[in-house]
Amino acid sequence: MALLAAATLNPTTHLSLRSRAGRNSENLWLRSTASSQKSKGRFCNLTIRAGTPSKPAEPIGPVFTKLKPWQIPKRDWFDKDFLFGASTSAYQIEGAWNEDGKGPSTWDHFCHTYPERISDMTNGDVAANSYHLYEEDVKALKDMGMKVYRFSISWSRILPDGTGKVNQAGIDYYNKLINSLIDNDIVPYVTIWHWDTPQALEDKYGGFLNRQIVDDYKQFAEVCFKNFGDRVKNWFTFNEPHTYCCFSYGEGIHAPGRCSPGMDCAVPEGDSLREPYTAGHHILLAHAEAVQLFKARYNMHGDSKIGMAFDVMGYEPYQDSFLDDQARERSIDYNMGWFLEPVVRGDYPFSMRSLIGDRLPMFTKEEQEKLASSCDIMGLNYYTSRFSKHVDMSPDFTPTLNTDDAYASSETTGSDGNDIGPITGTYWIYMYPKGLTDLLLIMKEKYGNPPVFITENGIADVEGDESMPDPLDDWKRLDYLQRHISAVKDAIDQGADVRGHFTWGLIDNFEWSLGYSSRFGLVYIDKNDGNKRKLKKSAKWFSKFNSVPKPLLKTTNNNATMTAASVSV
């Protein structure tokens, strides 16, 4: 996976007004373009468009509510070149963990060695069996009218030992997948690494804790460029490095499962205040080396793009105070800026340098030059938002995890006692579409408005949800996606350069430490019927949504006006 604005709208006239309203109590049919807290209340900038329906929009409220027909996003709200697609990752769907010469990954080792660390004691040995059923995945994409499929390459399927001899069977598998996508008019977007480092490198030198990983990753990336670059024109070097570093080396709940002694994790032999930054530093150096190689040898004609996919979370101040406003800024730095700031400007955010001290490694001048402006495209993986609450920097508070370093706690409930949005089937995801709009506007206003793709966005169905007894009737997912697609359009209307939206995920998959208890797919995987693929309600909606003939869609107009009212309030 699977867990910040003034608009110029053309050509319609519009009226802006300021209205005092609660976060979940807005009963107008309009779009929230910005919000800020003032004394004794919350103000929202609201834009009313001429010619749109006069009926009120349904507020999100504390629980899920289905949208009215006129609130549902339409494909012609977006430029014809805007890409809708879906995402997956290798370990979560492929299975065939030891077939055809594949070597074990850190996730193979983690699940086999510490099965109790997975909520349902499962693993990715078979997963959705996409290694054998990839054509069914391609068919599902085509049935939904999706134009893009973002998937990842299993490092240990290509290089079983992490380096050295290439496994031709692995190359053949990805060639077949890529060719099948292209034959069905679906564009492949490839993530080179999505958390599944070869276990051989973990055993040899500690994986991303050792600088040797930089050279070995570069070799792996070159194998990918050399074998697939004639057809793959869009690459992401790394997926969600922030979550990886925090969960794998801070809390230790993901492979390789390291944390400080005395903490509860699989391998309590690490340093939760230092190792996340060491691993993250090596990820950034590996990214820079791979990008330099790519641009020097494999993109001479300039027709390909490369970047990184960042996990991001939106933040609002816990209450109307200077300290919580500052806490919000630090939270954004530590969540989004940790990896984004270096690939834009060449170094970590100032707040991180100030608070972390010598635990945060330094870049050389040469490394900074390689990192700065190293992304042609950027991916944002957005699921949810939080309130950010200041934590006093006092002797009474001592950080124990790297996530404590921001001196800001992440809260699901604000000072008024209200949740930031309705909770979804997955405990950590609260629906807050405005958070996505806000982050896209940060990309525009703070980071130079680079081309951005929403590379992951979605929620999970969970076992035992009585409101959704039929696994194919995923109306909550549909509502969530519709509201977030509208939130993307909000940002586009305000000038953000957003190029696509990829739902997480294409199919139900192995959801890391949650196993198969959380189902994020547009497509249901029937484990009792040979992993048979079945389209859910959300998938069938995309089939209709994407059915608009391309000649009827607009061309290159990021400020195109919506044809229906926004619902991302």
From Swiss-Prot:
GO terms for biological process: carbohydrate metabolic process. Optimum pH is 5.5. It comes from the Eukaryota. SUPFAM superfamilies: (Trans)glycosidases. InterPro entries: Glyco_hydro_1, Glyco_hydro_1_AS, Glyco_hydro_1_N_CS, Glycoside_hydrolase_SF. The active site is at 240 (proton donor), 456 (nucleophile). Disulfide bonds join 259-265. It catalyses: Hydrolysis of terminal, non-reducing beta-D-glucosyl residues with release of beta-D-glucose; DIMBOA beta-D-glucoside + H2O = DIMBOA + D-glucose; DIBOA beta-D-glucoside + H2O = DIBOA + D-glucose. Keywords: Chloroplast, Disulfide bond, Glycosidase, Hydrolase, Plastid, Transit peptide. Its main location: plastid. One of its GO terms (cellular component) is chloroplast. Its EC number is 3.2.1.182, 3.2.1.21. Homo- and heterohexamers. Wheat is a hexaploid with three different genomes that contains at least four genes coding for GLU1: GLU1A (AC Q1XIR9), GLU1B (AC Q1XH05), GLU1C (AC Q1XH04) and GLU1D (AC D5MTF8). The monomers can aggregate in diverse combinations, reflecting the several isozymes found in the native enzyme described in PubMed:10750901. The hexameric structure is required for activity toward DIMBOA-beta-D-glucoside. Acts in defense of young plant parts against pests via the production of hydroxamic acids from hydroxamic acid glucosides. Enzymatic activity is highly correlated with plant growth. The preferred substrate is DIMBOA-beta-D-glucoside. This is 4-hydroxy-7-methoxy-3-oxo-3,4-dihydro-2H-1,4-benzoxazin-2-yl glucoside beta-D-glucosidase 1b, chloroplastic.
